[in-house]
Amino acid sequence: MTKKEQALIEQYGKSLVEVASEHHSLDTLQADVLAILETFETTNLDQSLSSLAVPHAEKIKLLTLLKGNNSVYMNNFLNLILQNEREAYLYQMLQAVLNEIAIVSNQYDVTVTSSLPLTEEQKSRVRAVVAKKFAVTAGRLIEKVDPSLIGGFIISVNNKVIDTSIRRQLQAFKMNLK
């Protein structure tokens, strides 16, 4: 992706978030974006929208199906994407919208990797640790299970990481023995 395309994607995302923020609709916008992104992840919609083999009329039909029960701002955004023929960048634009919402609201997704699934109590403790250590509000809690950690956990928020895994501690111990 070129710098020009990246700047375009970020500008579309930033503009949509600004409009929603002015109208106090960030939560609604975030829900709309997450629902559409889920559609992208469960289908090959991104490939269809970015393919030159798919006619523009088909892309219009696909995006019309996405409109559904979205907010006015999201539907207007999708119409704008269609008018400017930027369908190929929609997935990246929606990702940019989520990033911009996180920046504006200081609410970031939290990824927790542990050797075993977390209990509800542990999840609430993770949210408290994130709020205290990272000074951000925890958004979605994305849980991953990796038995190779042996024990402990890895918390990742906004490109910052806390790694208390036994695996890392063993690696550090091994390096100290050398």
From Swiss-Prot:
Primary location group: membrane
UniProt GO molecular function: proton-transporting ATP synthase activity, rotational mechanism
Location of the protein in the cell: Cell membrane
Entries under SUPFAM superfamilies matching the protein: N-terminal domain of the delta subunit of the F1F0-ATP synthase (SSF47928)
UniProt cross-references to Gene3D superfamilies, sorted A to Z: N-terminal domain of the delta subunit of the F1F0-ATP synthase
Cellular component annotations (GO), alphabetically ordered: plasma membrane; proton-transporting ATP synthase complex
Ranges in a coiled coil: none
Bilayer disposition of the protein: Peripheral membrane protein
Keyword Transport: yes
Keywords annotated in UniProt: ATP synthesis, Cell membrane, CF(1), Hydrogen ion transport, Ion transport, Membrane, Transport
InterPro entries for this protein: ATP_synth_OSCP/delta_N_sf, ATPase_OSCP/dsu
Pfam families: OSCP
Subunit structure, interactors included: F-type ATPases have 2 components, F(1) - the catalytic core - and F(0) - the membrane proton channel. F(1) has five subunits: alpha(3), beta(3), gamma(1), delta(1), epsilon(1). F(0) has three main subunits: a(1), b(2) and c(10-14). The alpha and beta chains form an alternating ring which encloses part of the gamma chain. F(1) is attached to F(0) by a central stalk formed by the gamma and epsilon chains, while a peripheral stalk is formed by the delta and b chains.
Family membership noted in the UniProt record: Belongs to the ATPase delta chain family.
Stated role: F(1)F(0) ATP synthase produces ATP from ADP in the presence of a proton or sodium gradient. F-type ATPases consist of two structural domains, F(1) containing the extramembraneous catalytic core and F(0) containing the membrane proton channel, linked together by a central stalk and a peripheral stalk. During catalysis, ATP synthesis in the catalytic domain of F(1) is coupled via a rotary mechanism of the central stalk subunits to proton translocation.
Name the record gives this protein: ATP synthase subunit delta
Record lineage: Bacteria, Bacillati, Bacillota, Bacilli, Lactobacillales
